Amino acid sequence: MMWSNFFMQEEDRRRTAVGRRRAQEQQNLGLTPEREGKIKLGLLVAIVGATLAVLAVGTEFWVELNTYKTNGSAVCEAAHLGLWKVCIKRLWQADVPAGRETCGPAELPGEANCTYFKFFTTGENARIFQRTTKKEVNLAAAVIAVLGLTAMALGCLCVIMVLSKGAESLLRLGAVCFGLSGLLLFVSLEVFRHSVGALLQGVNPETPPAPRLAYEYSWSLGCGVGAGLILLLGGVCFLLLTLPSWPWRSLCPKWGGPTA
């Protein structure tokens, strides 16, 4: 009985020592429950931006190209494209809204022909409605978008390491990665906008003549804009968490507590 009590006391002492050591490590790392909650909230914001970014880059509804409706024809053509592929659809004019002068929107049911851009493999330009893409601009937009996704993934990894390993020094790096990813997405959107302008001007001097086109940006590009804004917001939030608390206490004594 005496030996059993002795072993039980030793086990309690060991557990107490382990608990104190873990608490000391947590205190040394600076990850208080309140701070950990703020980091998790910032990570949640960044995950929303990451989801929108992947959705934008992976879909092909960045811009819609619509031909004008013609009298005496039952069908009309519209196209929608993104960073990787283009889809040309033949739509029934009866399905097009009556007050609309152009064919579309591209979400209407119809016969679709989707192809990936060949300038990623063979280096050939694509032809859309007797117009030729400018592959250098399209390639630049796609590469910049991929770099943005890479920076976003590195930012997520840094924040996860902060939460799991307590490596709080990586929080600043994560903030920079998220901010950089948001900026790269905006640059990719701007480069893509220039590629659309180059496509509309790249008319081939061939017969039959190229049809008149109207264009409108679609929901994939909207997701990209939202992703860039949210990722920038996440980067700013993480950057604020890396700043020391004493400047905020001096600027806002009511919020930061009493100052001596």
Curated annotation (Swiss-Prot):
Disulfide bonds: none annotated. GO terms for cellular component: L-type voltage-gated calcium channel complex. The keyword Phosphoprotein does not apply. Signal peptide: none annotated. It is found in: Cell membrane. It holds the Pfam family Claudin_2. It comes from the Eukaryota. The chain crosses the membrane at residues 43-63, 143-163, 169-189, 221-241. The keyword Zinc does not apply. It is a multi-pass membrane protein. Interacts with CACNA1C. Identified in a complex with the L-type calcium channel subunits CACNA1C, CACNA2D1 and either CACNB1 or CACNB2. Belongs to the PMP-22/EMP/MP20 family. CACNG subfamily. This is Voltage-dependent calcium channel gamma-6 subunit. It comes from Mus musculus.
